[in-house]
Curated annotation (Swiss-Prot):
Belongs to the Ycf4 family. The chain crosses the membrane at residues 22-42, 57-77. The keyword Cytoplasm does not apply. This is Photosystem I assembly protein Ycf4. InterPro entries: PSI_Ycf4_assembly. It comes from the Eukaryota. It is a multi-pass membrane protein. GO terms for cellular component: chloroplast thylakoid membrane; photosystem I. One of its GO terms (biological process) is photosynthesis.
Amino acid sequence: MSWRSESIWIEFITGSRKTSNFCWAFILFLGSLGFLLVGTSSYLGRNVISLFPSQQIIFFPQGIVMSFYGIAGLFISCYLWCTILWNVGSGYDLFDRKEGIVRIFRWGFPGKTRRIFLRFFMKDIQSIRIEVKEGVSARRVLYMEIRGQGAIPLIRTDENFTTREIEQKAAELAYFLRVPIEVF
């Protein structure tokens, strides 16, 4: 989602609050909870859940392994829910032609670098760079090349843009910033 005027362009970044992340966190939580309950029921020798009779799963080694997978899955699920709660990766890119300043803001993990804020002059922007790698794991990334700071990614790799959409966005941004486009 973006907002544009004659001299200002604001590009909003979604971050980790995506439908796919909610689905994965929920599925992982339920699956790992199931593994932990089956491991616990095999340890106790009673049916904690009535899907499997406890006599079919022996505690050593199946119950221990299922309990371990359940605990590990709960930790990973907790991590996913925390990234969703903190909305890690969300923010905005603000390009202001009137002031000649570019501001990039992202939310990070709690701590000293919770707020990631980059600010530089438009005259330091060398080019807009498109990096496209096709194949099994296709990767399309849009970078902004900054003099003295290297390349700063503007579009995340997990956003499923087609090559045409990336090219369109790069062309519009390069036209707005009045810089060339490089393709790799």
